Amino acid sequence: MQYQLSPSGDFKTSAPVRSSHGHRRSTESKKSGGHGNPYLSTDKTNLDISVSFLTSQAQKKMRGMSANHGIFDPTEMLTADDPSNYGYQFLNHATFYNNMDIMQAASGDVPPLMSVNPYKQSFDINDASAAMNMAQFAHTLNAIQNSSYSMSHYNQAPMQHFISPNSFHVSYNQRFPHIKKNATHANRMVEIKKINGHRYMEVTDPQAVSAPPEYKRLDGSLMGVSKSCLEASKKRPISAEPLYSRKVFIGGLPIDVSEEQVWATFGAFGKVLIDWPRRPEHNAERAEQELKKGSGSRAVTGYVFLVFTHERSVQELVNACEFYEDKYYLQLSSPTMTDKAVQVRPWRLSDIDYFCNDNSSVDHRRTVFIGGVPRPTRAQDLARCLEGHYGKVSYVGIDIDPELKYPKGAARVTFSTSQAFVRAISGRFVQVNHAENNKRVEIKPYVMEEQYCDECEGRLCKHNYAPYFCGHASCLQYYCEGCWDRMHIGKNEDNKLEDQHYPMVRTGDQTRLLKHLPHRSSGFKPAPVFHPSSQSTTAKILAYGDQSQRQFSATPSYSF
């Protein structure tokens, strides 16, 4: 006698099992290795189960489990809440066999791997031979082993739709729906509302105006900010005057944090746009490779930007934070981390400008432009940095977005003396230190608008504005077309690269360095400066800088 697995999931005794050799049967009896063990090693594996048998079991004991899929997925029996009812257990990581009886049958006779026909059809589909070959089956089980699945804390979500009969020729997007969902975040407008006594999140797509909003109820898993933090925030005063930019940086987010948790946490302070940073779009092949590695299309950066509708919401968010070492922190939870402190970095409007304490005048001809400034850098921090290298600074202005008043990563600095201005232009670079940021940025002359030629003062160009500015430390002047040719086109062709003088023009908010002159069709090669006057240009700039009060200039009157 031998124990066999009955269709109902029970064990029964039967006649001696006959081993098969092709289509011929032998009368040799096969001894069972189970000896009463409920987990018997039999010659019947999952590869031999027909789809009709699984379908009948689904109809009897798993009704409704596959209603959303249209067809029955055999793995749903393996991922059921109580798989012992079916005589099959969880998948074993260390073997190709996928039932628990082989895993625990230490004293039983485990059938060798070669006894199983790797190309034997197990499902009634056209591509069954290719779908269930052992190599692909092993690859699939290895993928399960590398996922978040474990025997002690079993989660059936990663197992669903993973080993279905037709799943071996689909993309990884369909094999790993949970990975894709957690890795790709979309920008959403979130507002928390109270409907029928319950709190809901109204989620809308800012790019789909006609799309109806989506509502998500705030249950136990999505509590957002604790009530104590909200109560403490309400007790603190709110200024009637704007104090912060409506755009806030959030750093240190857990990698596995969900969109819903971020919505619930920061939506508690008011209507907000969640702006997730993204990678550039990749092609399909690159995206498939990233999904194979377990990553999604969103860069794993750990930060997000918040754009609140009202500035008051930012003040409430700051009041709810803990202040530690000049930084604001707020607690946020994820599936793997509870109450993690994430950094909240608001931008104060008072940090946009810096003015020197003395009453020295601000000369715009001594202004430089600095790009690539770290966003947390305040105007006073940049002023101290430049004063330590080149000389006293009278004004610093951080370039901001006109609507949100958030830094754009650039600044304008005006020096108190012409000597400090020339030293900064000659130095070209400065190391900006702010907190943990340390960045080397370039210093360029700030090209202004509506400036007359410094050589002819408009007499030779009919008083038109000068289109060119020379940023070389020996020039630092505005030139009309005629004066540029007269002062820069020399006869010496052996000039070094650092001695070359290129024209700079201002177009809108951008300053460009031209490699050829627009008014000369054949182009030009920069040459050393050729001045007919005995006084050097630098000397004239230094003398002029102490008394000139000219206004900014930038965009030339010509279109190039």
UniProtKB/Swiss-Prot annotation:
Region (Disordered): 1-43
GO CC, one annotated term: neuron projection
Keyword Chloroplast applies: no
Biological-process GO terms, alphabetical: cell differentiation; meiotic cell cycle; negative regulation of cytoplasmic translation; regulation of translation; spermatogenesis
Annotated signal peptide: none
InterPro entries: CEBP_ZZ, CEBP_ZZ_sf, CPEB, Nucleotide-bd_a/b_plait_sf, RBD_domain_sf, RRM_dom
Keywords noted in UniProt: Developmental protein, Differentiation, Repeat, RNA-binding, Spermatogenesis
Domain RRM stretches: 246-349, 366-437
Keyword flag RNA-binding: yes
Entry's Gene Ontology molecular function annotations: mRNA 3'-UTR binding; mRNA regulatory element binding translation repressor activity; ribosome binding; translation factor activity, RNA binding
Domain of life: Eukaryota
PANTHER family registered for this protein in UniProt: CYTOPLASMIC POLYADENYLATION ELEMENT BINDING PROTEIN CPEB, CYTOPLASMIC POLYADENYLATION ELEMENT-BINDING PROTEIN 1
Physiological role: Cytoplasmic polyadenylation element binding protein that binds to and regulates the translation of specific mRNAs. Essential for progression through meiosis. Involved in spermatogenesis.
Oligomeric form and interacting partners: Interacts with fbf-1.
Name assigned to this protein: Cytoplasmic polyadenylation element-binding protein 1
Organism: Caenorhabditis elegans
